[in-house]
């Protein structure tokens, strides 16, 4: 409804504008809004900041211009072709460039339009003028009434907004946001991060290519600096950042505010202050960084949300799960679900894991303990694919998982939490867990049902619509368990799930873990809270300096002299004498 209302209002605005220059401005505003949406699809949702969207924009512009000049191709066909060229360029660019992260990715993206600028100049395309076709004005989009350009640009923008809206609400959009929030956690939850990023840059390239193609039709002249120049990429980035990254309306807000302002100032003051358009965008980005770092949309939304929260009654917090549980039947002779066989891993001269072998049986709770730096988290990273062992095997029901990606191991049935909690903070509690459910869900509706069930099991169903970033430490720990649980794991790896919790909170989380184990889920837990671990686990594995120090029942391990000397310490010996 909002999109329709915006389209009607913007379309009617063109009716009341007579001056051709202002109609031109009204026509290019949607073009830059589409460019902002294209940038946003990649950088706003997935978090991979691009300084190179001018590459797709310029290729689209030259595609339309060259096709019309050499083959007489109508822009009605040329613009879809420009979108295809942009999509192909996005895929070709993405395959090697996604090997990079952070500012390395951004700088690599910057290289593509700069290279293309010189390539097209070298090819002799310093300035291409689209041939005039007055006798076939409609076929070649050369209208005497410039309002038609406004309405066509608006139609393209509405299409891009509808597409973005569909992406935003789909598995595609949720996966991209999860990647933006925490790529490692997303992959551990079963998301094929590279595949989704390639889809994002392909779709982003298509939108940018279409925008470039229409831009060429409106201006009738294409030059390398105008379509491949740094200001093109900067405008796409700035209109999105000004309005709000990772949102449908952010790029539209940015384009509606900044494009008319920069163009009008350029017309009025361009002779006095050359390059004033760049000044406008520069001031805009500085202002938004200082006053609204996430953009106008998020600033307004946060203000409205805070006001509503102040008026609303305080909702009940996590429902504690401390009811009496049926005694869990231990099965020391159960089938082996997971096995680490002679695994070793070194980082330079440091051997973090040395020839470690452990077996985990179906339905048991195995505790892994040891001093800091013993190799516990490294072992977990070997078990769920974040690092590859230098030697040895990682076996899930006799299938070797060594070298598999975390999303593959998650899909095979291994869930994981992290030592430092890694929620998707800008997503709701329910959305966090839905992301974890996607890996084995039959449909989006099924993923939601599975997520709600997982939240109910950990006592967070009442917090489903709350932003994950507002949860307490205990709730975040439970949220990670729920997200891992939503993937229907056979083996659950819990990395210091009790860290930072008070005594009462520890009991609540232990109750949840016991409940899951009673359902037949096999659990391996790393923890330093020994009093709780002794009551929780069936068996201990003790690591020290990367090697296996001891293995056995809790009552045996807590009396083992070597374990006391290496880890538990004299206080434990005295307290339990």
Regions found by a protein language model. Give the residues of each.
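Intrinsically disordered, low-complexity segments enriched in polar/charged residues with Gly/Pro
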Residues: 20, 26-28, 83-85, 127-129, ...
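Residue-level detector of alpha-helix boundaries and kinks
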Residues: 11, 100, 161, 226, ...
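Transmembrane alpha-helices and adjacent helix-loop boundaries
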Residues: 1-318
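ABC-family P-loop ATPase nucleotide-binding domain
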Residues: 299-344, 572-577
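Residue-level marker of regulatory loop/turn positions in helix-turn-helix DNA-binding domains and
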Residues: 168, 178, 191, 230, ...
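Polar/charged alpha-helical tracts
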Residues: 15, 305-306, 320-323, 447, ...
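Glycine-rich phosphate-binding loops of nucleotide-dependent enzymes
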Residues: 333-339, 343-577
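General structural signal for alpha-helix termini and helix-helix connectors
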Residues: 94, 267, 325-329, 342, ...
């Amino acid at each position: 409804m909002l999109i329709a209302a915006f389209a009607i209002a913007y379309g009617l605005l063109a009716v009341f504008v007579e001056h051709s220059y202002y109609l031109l401005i009204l026509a290019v505003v949607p073009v830059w809004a589409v460019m902002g949406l294209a940038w946003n699809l990649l950088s706003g949702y997935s978090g991979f900041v691009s300084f190179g969207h001018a590459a797709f924009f310029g290729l689209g512009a030259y595609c339309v211009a060259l096709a019309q000049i050499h083959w007489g191709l109508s822009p009605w066909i040329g613009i879809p072709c420009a979108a295809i060229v942009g999509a192909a360029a996005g895929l070709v660019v993405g395959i090697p460039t996604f090997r990079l992260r952070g500012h390395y990715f951004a700088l690599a993206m910057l290289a593509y339009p700069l290279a293309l600028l010189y390539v097209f100049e070298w090819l002799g395309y310093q300035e291409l003028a689209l041939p005039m076709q007055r006798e076939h004005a409609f076929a070649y989009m050369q209208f005497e009434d410039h309002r038609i350009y406004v309405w066509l640009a608006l139609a393209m923008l509405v299409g891009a907004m509808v597409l973005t809206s569909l992406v935003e609400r789909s598995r595609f959009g949720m996966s991209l946001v999860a990647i933006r929030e925490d790529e490692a956690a997303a992959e551990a939850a079963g998301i094929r991060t590279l595949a989704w990023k390639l889809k994002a840059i392909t779709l982003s390239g298509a939108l940018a290519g279409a925008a470039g193609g229409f831009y060429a039709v409106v201006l009738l002249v294409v030059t390398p600096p105008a379509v491949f120049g740094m200001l093109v990429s900067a405008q796409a980035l700035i209109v999105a950042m000004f309005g709000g990254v990772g949102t449908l309306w952010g790029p539209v807000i940015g384009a509606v505010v900044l494009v008319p302002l920069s163009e009008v100032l350029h017309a009025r003051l361009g002779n006095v202050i050359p390059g004033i358009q760049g000044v406008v965008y520069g001031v805009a980005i500085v202002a938004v960084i200082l006053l609204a770092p996430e953009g106008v949309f998020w600033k307004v939304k946060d203000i409205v949300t805070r006001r509503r929260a102040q008026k609303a009654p305080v909702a009940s917090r996590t429902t504690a799960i401390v009811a009496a549980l049926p005694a869990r039947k231990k099965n020391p002779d159960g089938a082996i679900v997971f096995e680490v066989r002679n695994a070793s891993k070194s980082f330079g001269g440091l051997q973090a894991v040395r020839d470690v072998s452990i077996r985990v049986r179906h339905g048991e709770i195995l505790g892994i303990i040891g001093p800091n730096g013993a190799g516990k988290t490294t072992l977990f990273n070997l078990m769920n694919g974040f690092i590859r062992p230098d030697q040895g095997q990682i076996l899930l029901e006799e299938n070797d998982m060594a070298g598999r990606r975390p999303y593959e191991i998650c899909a095979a049935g291994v869930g994981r939490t992290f030592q430092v909690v890694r929620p998707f903070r800008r997503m709701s509690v329910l959305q966090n867990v839905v992301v974890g459910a996607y890996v084995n869900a039959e449909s989006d509706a099924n993923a939601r049902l599975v997520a709600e069930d997982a939240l109910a099991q950990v006592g967070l169903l009442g917090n489903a619509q709350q932003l994950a970033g507002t949860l307490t430490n205990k709730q975040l720990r439970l949220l990670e368990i729920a997200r891992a649980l939503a993937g229907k794991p056979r083996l659950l790896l819990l990395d210091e799930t009790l860290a930072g919790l008070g005594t009462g909170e520890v009991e609540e989380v232990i109750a949840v873990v016991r409940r899951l184990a009673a359902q037949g889920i096999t659990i391996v837990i790393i923890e330093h809270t020994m009093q709780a671990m002794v009551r929780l686990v069936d068996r201990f594995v003790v690591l020290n300096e990367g090697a296996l120090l001891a293995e056995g029942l809790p009552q045996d391990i807590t009396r083992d002299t070597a374990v006391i000397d290496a880890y538990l310490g004299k206080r434990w010996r005295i307290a339990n004498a």
